[in-house]
Amino acid sequence: MVKVSICVPAYKNPVGVERLLESVKVQSFTDYEVVVTDDSQDGSVEEVVRRAEVPGMVYVRNAVRKGATGNWNEAVRHASGEYIKIMHHDDWFTDRDCLARFVEMLEEHPEADLAFCGSRQVMLDGVGNRMGEEFDRAISDEHLKMISEDWRDLYIGDYIGAPSATIYRKGAPEYEEKLTWIVDVEFYMRLLQKNPRFVVSKEPLVSIGVSENQLTESCRTDGTLNIFEYGFVMQEFSLLSEEKYRQKFIQIALKYKMPFASLAPYGIPKKEYEKAAAKKRREDFVFYVGVAKRKVREAFGKKRFT
């Protein structure tokens, strides 16, 4: 058995897959296999995989398309390693020692099933090429304290980050295929529900490719999908009884201008929704009045306008 299975659920994007595989080949830690499950209809990804000649490669072309989350699970099903290292096809290891650092986190902390790191966010163009703009991000001390004390607070925000920033022990549950947008959050919550111990490094061990063409960008603007997924997770983990989680769900609805009827099936009290909606209207009014005043000042060149 190899130590790590690097699982790459691929769909098209040969540019990204090639960059990822090149970053794998230079890793100082070499006790790994690479599992690529290809959901593409054409042979562009397969060609890149064959050409890369990565040691320990397992390539699987899905006979029937699995979809995004289904393809994640398909990659993990073919893994034989002790540790599972998901790497999405837009992402790559930041430098040659990053895989070693991931392994060290779990090796040095046998009490934990999950480890995660910071990331380098890299802007990509429409075909996956780097555009030059990038920045590092990592969990804050405040958010680290929150999820250390109560893993359910991941419902309030994905403080762990993208799946590529994680490594976990084989035997974890599969990703929930009913979900698309917060599938990673739900997965982390199930892992930590079983074992709340985790390891974190704020180093940007992975680089995350960010572009407007990603699936996450379409999910970001879909109110109906967000209500379904946050409602699903609220029910799964019995979060309704706590106000902070109800308020998170209500704020999601208000963000997408979804009516109370969209929340009612999940047990959200109508008065609580109406109170939050009224507060948001007041805040929006103050904001837009401020915008209008700034525009008037700019138009008339005045230093002060009241």
PLM region spans:
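Short, acidic, metal-binding catalytic loop of nucleotide-sugar glycosyltransferases
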Residues: E22-D31
